[in-house]
Amino acid sequence: MGRRYFGTDGIRGTVGDAPITPDFVLRLGYAAGKVLAGSADVAAGSRPTVLIGKDTRVSGYMLEAALEAGFSAAGVDVMLAGPMPTPGVAYLTRALRLSAGVVISASHNPYHDNGIKFFSADGNKLPDDTEAAIEAWLEKPLECAASDGLGKARRLDDAAGRYIEFCKSTFPAAFNLRGLKLVIDCAHGAAYQIAPHVFHELGADVIPIGVAPNGFNINDGVGATAPDALVRAVRANHADLGIALDGDADRLQVVDAAGRLYNGDELLYVLVKDRIVTDGKVEGAVGTLMTNLAVEVALQREGVKFVRAAVGDRYVLEQLREHGWQLGAEGSGHILSLDRHSTGDGIVSALLVLAALKRSGRTLAQMLDGVTLFPQKLINVRMKPGADWKGSASIRAAIDAAEAALAGSGRVLIRASGTEPVLRVMVEAQQAADAVRHAETIADAVRAATT
């Protein structure tokens, strides 16, 4: 049976609309607390403790209070971290030997959205069976613990400082950032206090932007999903590099001194090349169905195997574990380096990139010399609900014709949206005109067959 509430990245929606309402979130805290209290990992007679962190959305106060009440009613203690990047919650949960971590965030979405995601005691996203158990408890009545069994809540002292030190520990001790001018865009989000300190304490001259959250401006014209602000700031300040995080700081985009933007696909290649230097060999790396073909070809030239996961950092992580590899990424800027952290971390990923540049003595453009991303054309085609696009001979013929024409110099990817009756048509080719032409031909075939 499919999950009713949990998606690939927790539970998310518009604040005030189900399920992101205070009454549901209170019950969610209670349900999660009951699952934790019944876990075999909780010693007899002890009380589970969870950590709650959040980004800077105004709704975070309300949802934090609701979660806290739900956990307390289930007999679970709560530590409150305040504004904290998603990977910071994952780290602190693991480092403090807590039962679970909870993040209140909708990542790169606008302020009127919010969400809840959970981490297990080891700093990983919850397994499917645990999420299913929480959903089962959501169907049961809320029975508050007796007064002597209620959970307690307290603020976690120096949560930010602990995470700052962790981030710095991932940067080679032999290196520092002295002499580098960096623009750090925190998207008015969870890392607004933390990220500038990390880079400053490692010696960089830091120019922070997106560090004035007001509850409503998270991701608004700033951050990893709106990198134009970073490009302008890098050029205006004659900076060496710019780093943009998103609202919960689990992804990044990088801009060089010339104003060129580098996405997760390109940064993955840079990190693999650096790891070959430090480790002598990298067996393989993981991208997604959307990873640019040029990166796959370039990695294979280096003798590195490449596996494509479904879109979503959760699936990249699954493939990394299955193959026993360390490095994976999405073009959106989610980068995983499992020997550094259990989850994607924008700050740590930025430090890995900076370490690679320090080690090589080269710029990003130089490290990517010979890797030219293939142009991509993406068209979203709205269909009639329930339309059988897979069974259409005309759509199949259009796809086959495009693949035959590209013949190894490009690719076609067709994906149905998981939330609306939309078919995503993506064509990648060495020439932009070819990508556009083939994508439009397939899109026309989809429209004719499904609308």
Swiss-Prot record:
EC number: 5.4.2.10
Alphabetized InterPro entries for the sequence: A-D-PHexomutase_a/b/a-I, A-D-PHexomutase_a/b/a-I/II/III, A-D-PHexomutase_a/b/a-II, A-D-PHexomutase_a/b/a-III, A-D-PHexomutase_C, A-D-PHexomutase_C_sf, A-D-PHexomutase_CS, Alpha-D-phosphohexomutase_SF
Post-translational modification: Activated by phosphorylation.
Cofactor dependency: Mg(2+)
GO molecular function per UniProt: magnesium ion binding; phosphoglucosamine mutase activity; phosphomannomutase activity
Domain of life of the native organism: Bacteria
Descriptive protein name: Phosphoglucosamine mutase
Organism: Burkholderia cenocepacia (strain ATCC BAA-245 / DSM 16553 / LMG 16656 / NCTC 13227 / J2315 / CF5610) (Burkholderia cepacia (strain J2315))
Gene: glmM
